[in-house]
């Protein structure tokens, strides 16, 4: 097999405290770009921003087909290496100098769990990059989205029919970084990383890096706004949604599931996407914030919840379940009333239904971790802590374990998807019932956004408190953890509380544009 050429360049570039303005300057209207940001949970102070300025390859999956689309000459040099790497596991459907389409065999649902995990699968469309560039002096970076519906390729879907809702989203969509801007807000430093996959492109890429550095001297802090409606529609009104909850409670009563998370989708116009993301960050700073700008959609959000995190150095795998919520305590003027806020938190902590729901999901996270981790390494590191956000507060826990040596982060994600806080338990039956009753794909909602590096490190957040924008319309989906004694209206209201932060940011931005 041909060796994988890799040369990396780094340079310090001017620091700017507003990554959204940097993104507007470097990537405005440019597809296949993304911004991933992190903030400290309690203080909400920005920690780090990762801005994928230029992508070499877009990797997208739908069903068992994976497409590798070279976006640059640099990326095109990698396609033959990918084909060679995957040759034994795929059938090649089409091949050009700029694009490679391959198809994997479907998962064998009759195989045992470990055999399923270790078998060739669509996850190898991403794994091939970590294997090709394992020796890279600077870890090669893949950033993007795992959709919720990726799981449908790995669980039995017999007799489940999904309606076409007019929204299109790949099962996964990742970008191989050609130029990555790494911003450290604590040190107030910025570094531009360039990844060269063919020696013929070294000079061109170094020149591109210089051009990016110059643009960083002229950041545009303000965005033009377009007028838009503030009317919100919902795919399931309260009555229809409560009927779904009532029918799902029958399945809980019969013992099919212990708990389940139905959801519904709110929609409204959103022509000012980046300005709305900035407004959301300002209103609701969160541990994980993201903005993905694809040719076919834009996805942005401020998620409080990690999906799966893995450190290759320690082989520690981590799940951060969030379950149990209350609205924040606002006074009549819309300001936080500390006394009311504290009372609501105490009510949340003492609520037996919320405790039961949370502990059930901690147990599910323990089961997920145990499936892929070494014996006796799984433990609950934090239990039922309180996290506060702009409009809602949550109970959170942290479950960790040491990944088995024959597995990697993608094996772990395959075993754990989708996260229990968006599905519930038993997980496979819950996901089947969700499809049966919602009757539509969830697309990005309940999936994961994050990155994978060639050194094996992996960090993702659950796609909640997010907006999926396509054809000028944004879709904000939110769910509720339903148990046997759940109140129907309370569950419907919970979806509204969870969607409020994103909807408010969209409405605020549209109102500014309409002035």
Q: Residue ranges of each PLM-predicted region?
A:
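Extended alpha-helical targeting/anchoring segments
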Residues: 1-515
């Amino acid at each position: 097999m041909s060796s994988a050429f890799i040369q990396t360049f780094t340079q310090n570039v001017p620091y700017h405290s507003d990554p959204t303005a940097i993104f507007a300057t470097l990537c405005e209207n440019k597809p296949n770009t993304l911004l991933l940001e992190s903030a400290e949970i309690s203080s909400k102070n920005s920690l780090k921003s990762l801005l994928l300025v230029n992508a070499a390859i877009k990797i997208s999956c739908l069903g068992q087909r994976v497409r590798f689309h070279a976006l640059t000459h640099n990326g095109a040099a990698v396609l033959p290496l990918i084909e060679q790497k995957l040759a034994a596991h795929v059938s090649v459907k089409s091949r050009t100098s700029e694009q490679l389409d391959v198809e994997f065999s479907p998962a064998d649902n009759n195989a045992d769990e470990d055999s399923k995990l270790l078998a060739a699968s669509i996850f190898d469309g991403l794994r091939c990059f970590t294997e090709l560039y394992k020796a890279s002096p600077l870890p090669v970076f893949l950033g993007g989205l795992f959709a919720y519906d990726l799981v449908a390729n790995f669980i039995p879907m017999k007799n489940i029919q999904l309606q076409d809702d007019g929204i299109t989203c790949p099962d996964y969509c990742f970008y191989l970084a050609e130029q990555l801007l790494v911003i450290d807000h604590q040190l107030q430093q910025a570094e531009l990383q360039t990844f060269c996959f063919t020696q013929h492109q070294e000079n061109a890429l170094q020149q591109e890096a210089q051009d990016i550095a110059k643009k960083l001297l002229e950041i545009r802090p303000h965005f033009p706004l377009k007028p838009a409606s503030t009317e919100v529609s919902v795919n399931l009104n309260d009555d229809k949604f409560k009927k779904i909850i009532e029918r799902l409670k029958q399945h809980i009563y019969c013992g099919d599931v212990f708990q389940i998370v139905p959801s519904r989708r709110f929609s409204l116009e959103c022509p000012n996407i980046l300005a709305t993301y900035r407004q959301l960050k300002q209103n609701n700073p969160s541990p994980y914030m993201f903005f993905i700008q694809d040719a076919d959609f834009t996805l942005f959000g401020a998620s409080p919840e990690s999906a799966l995190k893995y450190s290759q150095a320690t082989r520690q795998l981590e799940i951060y379940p969030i379950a149990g919520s209350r609205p924040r305590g606002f006074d009549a003027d819309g300001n936080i009333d500390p006394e009311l806020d504290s009372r609501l938190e105490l009510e949340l902590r003492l609520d037996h239904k919320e405790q039961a729901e949370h502990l059930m999901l901690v147990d599910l996270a323990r089961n997920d971790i145990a499936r892929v981790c070494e014996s006796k390494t799984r433990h609950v590191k934090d239990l039922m802590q309180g996290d506060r956000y702009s409009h809602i507060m949550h109970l959170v826990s942290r479950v960790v374990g040491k990944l088995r040596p024959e597995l990697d982060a993608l094996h772990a994600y395959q075993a754990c998807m989708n996260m229990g806080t968006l599905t519930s338990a038993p997980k496979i039956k819950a996901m089947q019932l969700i499809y049966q009753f919602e009757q539509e794909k969830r697309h990005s909602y309940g999936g994961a956004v994050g990155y994978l590096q060639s050194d094996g490190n992996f960090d993702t957040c659950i796609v909640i408190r997010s907006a999926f924008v396509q054809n000028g319309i944004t879709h904000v989906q939110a769910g509720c953890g339903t148990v046997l004694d759940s109140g129907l209206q309370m569950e419907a209201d919970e979806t509204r509380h969870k969607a409020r932060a994103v909807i408010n940011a969209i409405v605020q931005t549209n109102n500014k544009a309409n002035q």
